[in-house]
C-alpha cells in the first residue's frame, strides 16, 4: 500500500474504528488544518493537530458510541488521498444540542487529505449534514421540505 493511502487507512481503521486515540500523535501534524463543507456551506478553516483530533473523535464517540466508518473508495495521487466513506452509528448521547434519539444514522462523507512528511497536514471534509440532521429528526426529511416549498411557492409566500 502506498504511504499516503496507508496513513489514511490508519486514520479510519485505527483512530476511528479501533478507538486508538494515540494514533493521532503518529499521523497528524501539529499544525494540521481542517476545512469543513457542510451541505454546501464552507466553514472557517480550523487548526486540528493531534490533541484536537483526539478531542474531536472522543466527542463523536460520546454521542455515537458504536460509530464506524467504511471506506468505499480511495484514490491516491502524489501527496493527496481522496476517500468516499460511509459513517454509521447510533445516537446515544447529546450531540450539537440534540438529545439522544436512539436512532441509527448512516451518512456519506468525501474527504481529501494532504500528506506532508508522513503525516496528515491538511484535510477537506464534505459531510452530508442535512441527511444527518434529517435522520436524527432535527429537520424535516427532503420530501417534506419540498412539499412545504411547493406550497409556499404556490401561495406566493417565501
Give short role names for the model-derived ranges.
Residues 1-158:
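C-terminal and inter-domain tail/linker signature
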